[in-house]
Amino acid sequence: MKICDTVNSKLYKNDRAILHSDCNCFYASVECLLNPNIRDLPVAVSGDAENRHGIILAKNEEAKKYNIKTGEAIWQAKKKCPQLLTVPARLDVYKKFSDKVRRIYSNYTDMVEPFGLDEAWLDISEDYKNDALTIAKEISQRIKDEIGITVSIGVSFNKIFAKFGSDYKKPDAITCITRDNYKTLVWNSPAGDLLYVGGATRKKLEQIGIYTIGDIANAPIGLLRTHLGKWGDLIYGFANGYDSSPVARIGEYSEVKSIGNSTTAVRDLKNLDDIKVIAYVLCDSVCRRMREQGFMGKTVCVSMRDTGLSTITRQHTLNTYTSLTSDITKAAMALFKENFDNKSPLRSIGVSVTDFAHNNIPRQMDIFSDERKIIAEEKLDKTLDKLKQRFGNYIIRPASLLTDRGLSAFNPKDEHTIHPVGYL
């Protein structure tokens, strides 16, 4: 176990003691634990290669030596490492191991907030504030001894810096980020190392001369707002250590904030016609789940990942709340049409809806609304939902999906994949 910066590991009197624990190469580590014969080989866990969902979901330390990247296609990974051993993902198995790890966390606090299957925040302020580093060491050793995998743990006074700490040194390491050392450890790191600064945000920051987390922390807040909107305020606060978000308690009710689906296509999507086929299936799935849970949404988000693994996300807020498949599909396609450049084929796309209201609120109408048409569409959607629930997803489909049965032959509602956080 490697421990980074024990000299500056003391938290201040009024600080919280937050841990972020990350199971190293989780999916791959579990597979190697269950099959010791492959432990010393380059191993990657992947999706279904036959349906071109054969992307790398996780890899072990040996595979990392060949620069294997999460999210790339199996064939690309094997080009770098011909001897790469790929094993299919077994989410039910990983869920059981995740539960075992969380049971150890719960021995120390009831404030355990999962972040995917492989990561979690712990708030140990109440009982172990003055012994945060000691507790981190103990948790790390117990997981290694009792379960057989390793974790990297960040110790800090807020969730953002604790997460940074767990990423700072891997595998099997503990890093303390305190008020005395964060300007050295955090500020000198690339902007993209800050939680929630994705590829698109990083590129926008680079365009205005911001390359490190320290650059974000010391940038004029007005500059960040101009180029990033409210997101600029958020990451400015994160970079300066202002995060005060609480760690949720075990079993604490968490209100649904978004409903979405994404998929890797069986072939590259080269035009809007290709995108439309998959987008409809995704939108239909999202809207069915919204209706099942009694929600209507107002903000539609789309994501696009090209063959170079570059991802962009865009969103649009509607004038009224809706759960109609036609409304969400229309908004999603407008975003795809506006942002797809026809030059870079897409490997995967996603659709999600946020900004919810319960479907029992009065319908908001405007002068352009056709209430009779809306009521008719609501009845149609509900009827189709019942048919699909009883007879399966393929019992009835729009004729437009028949133009390419290969692209549309998936059911995201039933085949939703849980990816490790690193994939996102």
Residues of each region from the PLM?
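Gly/Gly-Pro- and Ser/Thr-rich, intrinsically disordered tail segments characteristic of DNA damage-repair
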Residues: M1-G237, I250, R288, I374-L424
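DNA-contacting surface of Y-family translesion DNA polymerases
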Residues: L11, H20, K203-L346, H419
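Short, charged/polar surface micro-motifs in flexible loops or helix N-caps
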Residues: F26, A49-R52, T307-S310, F356-N359
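Short Gly/Ser/Thr- and Asp/Glu-enriched loop/turn motifs at secondary-structure junctions
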Residues: F115-E119, S156-K159, F295-T299, S344-S348
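Short, hydrophobic beta-strand segments
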Residues: A120-E126, T313-H316, R363-S369
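C-terminal hydrophobic structural anchor segments
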Residues: D327, M333-R390
